[in-house]
């Protein structure tokens, strides 16, 4: 047997008196193994503390007490607060978390999810800006339960926890319309359902309710990055807009500083409402008025929902919508 600290599949196979292929089949849950052989291999895995022993115990109980969490950007303040809510409830119910970042890349997102499935997680919480058809296909093929947190599902297929982003957009427009008739929508990528379908619809409806026309020239698309907001500032000014509803806090912070650089005073010359009320809204000067979301609760409630599904408990609601509001600060009058 190895004399170093690393126990290998070879060590397990030799100790159990079986082939390495048999050990692999046991660890991966292959049913083509005799029951007495399976038990013997699992016993050796436990005794030698072979690295997949947690998985092996999970195969015996059909649970690994591990939950995969897919996050699009681990550095994003909004998603990091969501993840904190998930982790706290997971700890309360004695689940371990495997946090996996997709880096806002669709292909990596698919790979990340398949990796979590391969780890035999008991469930997945998905956070993302949109659900691609590839992701939907992966979720529909798998037996592993999935809950969406802060993610829009227009097809209403998956359990989810969210706020009403359309109504939130309407509320933002209503506040800005008190002093302005040219209100820009500074959006993240419009391919994301939360922007192109939900927030945009709310923005249009908000304008309609205030008797204001919708103009495509007042809709600006950008990535969720500070620099993109900063660079957009002059275009927003040139559009004639004197106020903006912004889809993301980092983007809004960039726009705010870009307006200052262009000689505009906020809120005297230009008003801004952002969307997430993350800590970024408090780091700017002035602090940003924002749609207030119970971000931590979005994660915590999603994790509690997942524990119910994993324990075969009945869900009272498949889609939970939490309350939102507007927290007025220094970027509005």
From Swiss-Prot:
Q: Describe the location of the HTH lacI-type domain by residue ranges.
A: 7-61
Q: Give a yes or no for keyword Cell wall biogenesis/degradation in this entry.
A: no
Pfam families membership: LacI (PF00356), Peripla_BP_3 (PF13377)
Q: Which SMART domains match?
A: HTH_LACI
**GO molecular function terms listed in the Swiss-Prot or TrEMBL record:** DNA-binding transcription factor activity; transcription cis-regulatory region binding
Matching InterPro entries, A to Z? CcpA (IPR006377), HTH_LacI (IPR000843), LacI/GalR-like_sensor (IPR046335), Lambda_DNA-bd_dom_sf (IPR010982), Peripla_BP_I (IPR028082)
- For this protein, the parts annotated as crossing the membrane are none
Q: Report what the protein is called.
A: Catabolite control protein A
Species in which this protein is naturally found: Streptococcus mutans serotype c (strain ATCC 700610 / UA159)
């Amino acid at each position: 047997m190895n004399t170093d600290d690393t126990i290998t599949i070879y060590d397990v196979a030799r100790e159990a008196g079986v082939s390495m292929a048999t050990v692999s089949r046991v660890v991966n849950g292959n049913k083509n193994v005799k029951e007495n052989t399976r038990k013997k291999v699992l016993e050796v895995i436990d005794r030698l503390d072979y690295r997949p022993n947690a998985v092996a115990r999970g195969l015996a109980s059909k649970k690994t007490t591990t939950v995969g969490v897919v996050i699009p950007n681990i550095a994003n303040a909004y998603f990091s607060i969501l993840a904190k809510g998930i982790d706290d409830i997971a700890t309360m119910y004695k689940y371990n978390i495997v946090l996996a970042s997709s880096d806002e890349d669709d292909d990596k997102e698919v790979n990340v999810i398949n990796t979590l499935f391969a780890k035999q997680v008991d469930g997945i919480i998905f956070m993302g800006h949109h659900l691609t058809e590839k992701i939907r296909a992966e979720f529909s093929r798998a037996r592993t339960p999935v809950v969406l947190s802060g993610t829009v599902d227009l097809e209403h297929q998956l359990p989810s926890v969210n706020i009403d982003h359309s109504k939130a957009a309407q509320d933002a427009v209503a506040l800005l319309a008190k002093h302005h008739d040219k209100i820009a929508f500074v959006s993240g990528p419009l391919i994301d359902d939360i922007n192109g379908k939900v927030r945009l619809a709310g923005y249009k409806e908000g304008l309609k309710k205030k008797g204001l026309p919708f103009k495509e020239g007042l809709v600006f698309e950008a990535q969720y990055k500070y620099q993109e907001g900063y660079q957009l500032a002059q275009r927003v000014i040139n559009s004639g807009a004197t106020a903006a509803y912004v889809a993301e806090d980092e983007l809004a912070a960039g726009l705010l500083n870009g307006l200052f650089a262009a000689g505009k005073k906020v809120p005297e010359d230009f008003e801004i409402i952002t969307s997430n009320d993350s800590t970024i809204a408090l780091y700017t000067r002035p602090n940003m008025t924002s749609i207030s979301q119970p971000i931590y609760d979005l994660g915590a409630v999603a994790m509690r929902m997942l524990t119910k599904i994993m324990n075969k408990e009945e869900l009272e609601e498949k889609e939970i919508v939490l309350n939102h509001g507007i927290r007025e600060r220094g970027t509005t009058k």
